[in-house]
Amino acid sequence: MYQKLALISAFLATARAQSACTLQAETHPPLTWQKCSSGGTCTQQTGSVVIDANWRWTHATNSSTNCYDGNTWSSTLCPDNETCAKNCCLDGAAYASTYGVTTSADSLSIGFVTQSAQKNVGARLYLMASDTTYQEFTLLGNEFSFDVDVSQLPCGLNGALYFVSMDADGGVSKYPTNTAGAKYGTGYCDSQCPRDLKFINGQANVEGWEPSSNNANTGIGGHGSCCSEMDIWEANSISEALTPHPCTTVGQEICDGDSCGGTYSGDRYGGTCDPDGCDWNPYRLGNTSFYGPGSSFTLDTTKKLTVVTQFETSGAINRYYVQNGVTFQQPNAELGDYSGNSLDDDYCAAEEAEFGGSSFSDKGGLTQFKKATSGGMVLVMSLWDDYYANMLWLDSTYPTNETSSTPGAVRGSCSTSSGVPAQLESNSPNAKVVYSNIKFGPIGSTGNSSGGNPPGGNPPGTTTTRRPATSTGSSPGPTQTHYGQCGGIGYSGPTVCASGSTCQVLNPYYSQCL
């Protein structure tokens, strides 16, 4: 992910503490999700969401005077990191009226521009296990499924659902001066080592703060916050990408200045994290008709779809989709010597060889990334626009001086003049993304949890399961690879699974070698 959101406000408080204020009550919007077992039985979990601390009103502990206004700090309340943490506190959130965030049962809607006393742009939220703890997921050996509606997201917007290795308590146990914690959305980190965070590790980030030249609400401080990141879904109605980002140190850690690397630093590759990742964007890989708005695309983004991501114990990452009762595997990619549809070591090596760069492998690749997915990761759901690169890295030609003949440069059909945040906020303020029907469990468990129908769709009278062509073997017939499709209504590919796996029915339209 080239940048994780242009942020709005901050957090903290007394006695060098990161504490909470009481002028606005903090009530987390409820959100249910499902935990599934290997037999395909899923049980409802009662959760909630919390907005990130950077969006919150930060004011004096003894008054409503702003500690941070626009993109600058109060020189009186915040002359340095320690004094600022002592003088300022983080307040509660009016989720719907201020931030455009609403929930209903298992559905979360995030609006783009919300106008209340002030203008708010986008949001970043975390799934909660309790009122004071983020929900953690161990991805390795499991699969994660959700429904998403990106129909209202034009070029330049990013409805991102992803995981990061941030602390479940928001950093409270590591940094005792942080008493606000997960209840108020503290402790964020990602592979860009963001420096636009107002406070990190219970300390202010005011020293060295430089207000943004093109964003009236943000700036960059002297510190950043790093950790591993798994981008399950970065998407709008035009393009989508799946991207793991390893770090040499898995969990959250603070960094200094340009040595942070990432989007916010002069030396992009100077930090401990991989800012580029090993991405799987079907359009970038040459399949320009797989994903987009309208019936001419395999996946029609004018309609809701289900996204299922599987994390093999080998470290490989697999993906399939369901829409209108039809299951679609990730389309095959032909990249150098690589041919297949699994994001594995061979694919990532081929991508670096063909598209350039070595950041992913330099930071340990999938072997290092497994250290993150084998531990707890926090679920993040967001909507944002990009003041650094106009989201062209997701949905257009990037860098903009490249052409269609440059391998990997074309990532989507959007114009290189699209995605300008000021224009988006003016022309598409009502844009939104909706995430729903979250399920998590062992590989093969989430697709059969709705009474035998594919997740996210109703079984039509007659359907076919579309999949990319696979190579065929000699008699007695082709063999499907582990985790490949091996059956389903309308399916005509290999039905015999490779040694060590068997063909298991997940729903009438999709069977998989497990």
From Swiss-Prot:
Q: Where is this region: Disordered?
A: 401-427, 444-481
Name all CBM1 domain ranges: 478-514
Q: Where is the composition biased (Low complexity)?
A: 460-479
Enzymatic class = hydrolase
Q: EC number(s) for this protein?
A: 3.2.1.91
The signal peptide stretch is 1-17
Segments for region (Linker) = 454-478
Q: According to its UniProt record, which reaction does this protein catalyse?
A: Hydrolysis of (1->4)-beta-D-glucosidic linkages in cellulose and cellotetraose, releasing cellobiose from the non-reducing ends of the chains
Q: Which SUPFAM superfamilies match?
A: Cellulose-binding domain (SSF57180), Concanavalin A-like lectins/glucanases (SSF49899)
InterPro entries, per the entry = CBD_sf, Cellulose-bd_dom_fun, ConA-like_dom_sf, Glyco_hydro_7, Glyco_hydro_7_sf
Region annotated Catalytic, chain positions:
18-453
Q: Which GO terms describe its molecular function?
A: cellulose 1,4-beta-cellobiosidase activity; cellulose binding
One Gene Ontology cellular component annotation held by this UniProt entry? extracellular region
The record's family statement is:
Belongs to the glycosyl hydrolase 7 (cellulase C) family.
Q: What name does UniProt use for this protein? A: Exoglucanase 1
Task: Name the species this protein comes from.
Answer: Hypocrea rufa
Question: Which gene name belongs to this protein?
Answer: cbh1
